[in-house]
Amino acid sequence: MKVVAFERQQQGTGASRRLRNAGKTTGIVYGGEAAPQKIELDHNALWHALKKEAFHASILDLEIAGQSQQVLLRDVQYHPFKQLVLHVDFQRVDAKKKLHTKVPLHFLNAEVSPAVKLSSAIVSHVTTEIEVECLPSALPEFLEVDLSKIEAGQSLHAKDIALPNGVALVAHVDAENPVVASATVPAGAVSDAAEGETPAA
């Protein structure tokens, strides 16, 4: 995904306010051997890009003054109550070095699972992203979590996620193995089932 930015000449709080009034958003690019670079971006284009999941979890081609560099979106600052992006941070990536970043989870097949079909359970998504490490070329836009076999009362953990070749959970996630989804039967559903039972003679 391509992002066009411009080198920022004006600095300071007053300058940032003037840029926002002109429909621009401030940002910074850091990392690698190059010095941090202050940039500005078109706010409306950035606002729409931020609505796309891939913009948050993909290697982006950031073009500044005709020169392109590969980056990851690392931070976004929003106005507390206006639909306004105040600032963005991008980190340069090295094609030969592994990176750590969070990848979105896409949950599939809950509706055909034993938990839902047999027990009328509710499958909850405990987290919507997981942190992985990989080379930039191996970074997936998302990871799929197959819920087709989950049963009532069961949970799926981070290590249950099928990872593509070259992608691994970061060390602390691998060690903690957190829950990513769980299936629970609502109390009302249990009561309904109990009421439907035939009393013993």
Swiss-Prot record:
Protein name: Large ribosomal subunit protein bL25
Record GO cellular component, one term: cytosolic large ribosomal subunit
GO MF term (any one): structural constituent of ribosome
Classification lineage: Bacteria, Pseudomonadati, Pseudomonadota, Betaproteobacteria, Burkholderiales
Keywords on record: Ribonucleoprotein, Ribosomal protein, RNA-binding, rRNA-binding
Species this protein is from: Burkholderia vietnamiensis (strain G4 / LMG 22486)
Stored InterPro entries: Rbsml_bL25/Gln-tRNA_synth_N (IPR020056), Ribosomal_bL25/Gln-tRNA_synth (IPR011035), Ribosomal_bL25_b-dom (IPR020057), Ribosomal_bL25_C (IPR037121), Ribosomal_bL25_long (IPR001021), Ribosomal_L25_dom (IPR029751), Ribosomal_uL5_bac-type (IPR020930)
Function: This is one of the proteins that binds to the 5S RNA in the ribosome where it forms part of the central protuberance.
Gene giving rise to this polypeptide: rplY
One Pfam family here: Ribosomal_TL5_C
Assembly and oligomerization: Part of the 50S ribosomal subunit; part of the 5S rRNA/L5/L18/L25 subcomplex. Contacts the 5S rRNA. Binds to the 5S rRNA independently of L5 and L18.
Family classification: Belongs to the bacterial ribosomal protein bL25 family. CTC subfamily.
BP GO terms, sorted: translation
